[in-house]
Regions:
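Conserved pre-motif I regulatory segment
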Residues: 1-23
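Walker A/P-loop
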Residues: 17-37
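Conserved Walker A/P-loop ATP-binding site and its immediately adjacent core
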Residues: 31-36, 42, 46-68, 163
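Loop/turn-to-beta-strand initiation segments
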Residues: 47-48, 102-106, 124-126, 150-156
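Conserved helix-turn-beta segment of the N-terminal RecA-like "Helicase ATP-binding" lobe
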Residues: 57-91
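Conserved motor-coupling elements within RecA-like helicase/translocase cores
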Residues: 84-107
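Conserved RecA-like ASCE ATPase "motif II neighborhood" in helicase/translocase motors
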Residues: 101-143
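Post-DEXD/H (motif II) to motif III coupling segment of the RecA-like Helicase ATP-binding lobe
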Residues: 133-193
Length: 194
């Protein structure tokens, strides 16, 4: 898998930071950056990686994208049709996680079901938040903040970061949760690169 220069810059930023925001315009290949990082992580040894998407359909699509490159056991934590082992019962999630301890594991979930992984109490090595502007919603922020604190590595991918200027509402400008912007690719740069 060959990365374009801006994707390699993003991958290097991820390798140098345990948490942060990766801002790349739509169509810029954010998913490939996450996949390449996941491949590198899994080559190091047994890892648990979580991929969070805003919708079940996107979780399934991301699963197929990751599965093409990453050798790992797959679990889906959401309420939709999965085609893989899955469910939202925290005990079942923890049992699956423990049962597959000799393998790399990737868990695909949605923002709506992320709290079920929190309740399962599993150790997460890396978590990727796709379309991370969704993570600031009040129904999701508790689980997002939990994994921001307890996952070893935590990355927020978006084309459109959502900031807040009021203390009553969480925004991606809260670096204690979302980290700093570790890579920002302007749209004209993508056009330059073709």
């Amino acid at each position: 898998m060959q990365l374009r220069p801006h994707q390699q810059t993003a991958l290097d930023a991820i390798a140098s930071n345990s948490k942060g925001q990766v801002i790349i315009p739509t169509g810029g290949g954010k998913t490939l950056v996450a996949i390449k990082d996941a491949v590198r992580q899994c080559e190091e040894g047994r890892k648990t990686i979580v991929v969070v998407a805003p919708r079940i359909l996107l979780a399934r699509q991301l699963c197929e994208d990751f599965r093409e490159y990453v050798d790992a056991k797959i679990f889906h934590c959401h309420s939709g049709y999965r085609g893989y082992v899955g469910g939202t019962n925290p005990e079942w999630i923890a049992q699956w996680h423990d049962h597959e301890k000799d393998y790399n594991r990737i868990i695909h979930t949605t923002y709506h079901s992320l709290h079920k992984l929190q309740e399962a109490g599993i150790k997460v090595d890396t978590i990727y938040f796709d379309e991370a502007h969704n993570s600031v919603q009040k129904n999701f922020i508790e689980a997002v903040e939990y994994f921001s604190l307890y996952a070893d590595r935590c990355y927020f991918f978006t084309a459109t970061p959502k900031h807040s200027l009021t203390p009553m509402k969480v925004g991606m400008n809260e670096s204690d949760i979302f980290g700093e912007v570790i890579c920002k690719v302007p749209a004209p740069k993508l056009v330059e690169q073709g």
